[in-house]
Amino acid sequence: MASIVASKRIPLFRLVEQLLAASPAQGAASALRPVAVAGGSRAYNTGAQLRRHERDESDDDSGRGYDTRRPTRDATMPAFFSDVFRDPFSAPQSLGRLLSLMDDLATPAGRAGAATLRRGWNAKESEEALHLRVDMPGLGKEHVKVWAEQNSLVIKGEGEKEAGEDEGAAPARYSGRIELAPEVYRMDQIKAEMKNGVLKVVVPKVKEEQRRDVFQVNVE
């Protein structure tokens, strides 16, 4: 073989191709790894999250490629839902979106999805006012601030570090900003009450006949 390479000066990769072509069919077939096919025997959940995984070639091929495990957070719930009053750097949320979430939870599917997720706040709107409730366990009224600025309702709360806690432990913090239309709500008449770790905020609404952005049209 060495004499052939020396005499004909065949490149190494050409020689490898010739050797592979001359191998028995059964030997070539044995060198091929079987491909696992995800057939109909695997039951898929339509509500499960489908994620693509890149694995090393040394991994087992069985069930390779996709992970159908259900994510820890229910897929029907928005990511910001449980943290709307927890993330100090969260972007302002529109009132319409918050109320839409409450409507979704009122449906059977929404109640089922919220069963595994503790809701720490509630929002509802009546003809007279907007009512908000925020759970802030461990906090008193001296730890909470509520104010209105730039057409937004801002709620912030920060607890105190208790004696005996780890130095790296941070006190409980709550923060939220909700955009409100000034022509609909009386931003200068907001009322807030903190009692037993629960903050209740009431934002009065402008009466229909007093709204400047509503114009009645006569029907002829």
Swiss-Prot record:
PANTHER family to which the protein is assigned, alphabetical: 23.5 KDA HEAT SHOCK PROTEIN, MITOCHONDRIAL, SMALL HEAT SHOCK PROTEIN HSPF
Keyword Transit peptide in annotation: yes
Localization per Swiss-Prot or TrEMBL: Mitochondrion
Main location: mitochondrion
Residue span, sHSP domain: 112-220
Tissue expression: Expressed in roots, stems, leaves, spikelets and embryos.
Cystine crosslinks: none
Region (Disordered): 46-73
Gene: HSP24.1
Name of the protein this chain belongs to: 24.1 kDa heat shock protein, mitochondrial
Protein family according to the UniProt entry: Belongs to the small heat shock protein (HSP20) family.
